[in-house]
């Protein structure tokens, strides 16, 4: 089969930019800044059964606290009913809570730990 064009293809006419009349609007692109991620604090709750030494070991092992800092946080938990172990992104905070709860369960202690958004 032979296909024949009925007319030759035409190019669109060349356009020239219009002279600037001073009324042109120039839009500037601003770089978008993503907000920082929501941070969460890991809070350990006091109970009357978990030994203080176990709380200190957990703070050292899972939150990389030195003995003095871990003892200070443990005393805050004991005296105030709760204490902040650290501030992390959502995923890291959730992982740390799970680690603490697993360690407490394996050791037979009722220690509770939660994460809450930082205000």
UniProtKB/Swiss-Prot annotation:
Region (Disordered) residue spans: 1-33
GO biological process: protein catabolic process; proteolysis
Top-level taxon of the source organism: Bacteria
Record's subunit section: Binds to the N-terminal domain of the chaperone ClpA.
HAMAP family listed in its UniProt record: ClpS (MF_00302)
Role according to the record: Involved in the modulation of the specificity of the ClpAP-mediated ATP-dependent protein degradation.
Family: Belongs to the ClpS family.
Protein name stated in the entry: ATP-dependent Clp protease adapter protein ClpS
């Amino acid at each position: 089969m032979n296909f024949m064009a009925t007319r030759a293809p035409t190019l669109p006419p060349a356009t020239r930019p219009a002279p600037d009349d001073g009324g042109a609007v120039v839009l500037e692109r601003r770089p978008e800044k993503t907000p920082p991620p929501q941070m969460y604090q890991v809070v350990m709750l006091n109970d009357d059964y978990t030994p203080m030494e176990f709380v200190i070991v957990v703070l050292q092992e899972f939150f990389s606290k030195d003995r003095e800092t871990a003892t200070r946080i443990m005393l805050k938990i004991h005296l105030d009913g709760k204490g902040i172990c650290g501030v992390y992104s959502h995923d890291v905070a959730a992982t740390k809570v799970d680690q603490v709860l697993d360690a407490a369960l394996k050791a037979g202690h009722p220690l509770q730990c939660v994460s809450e958004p930082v205000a």
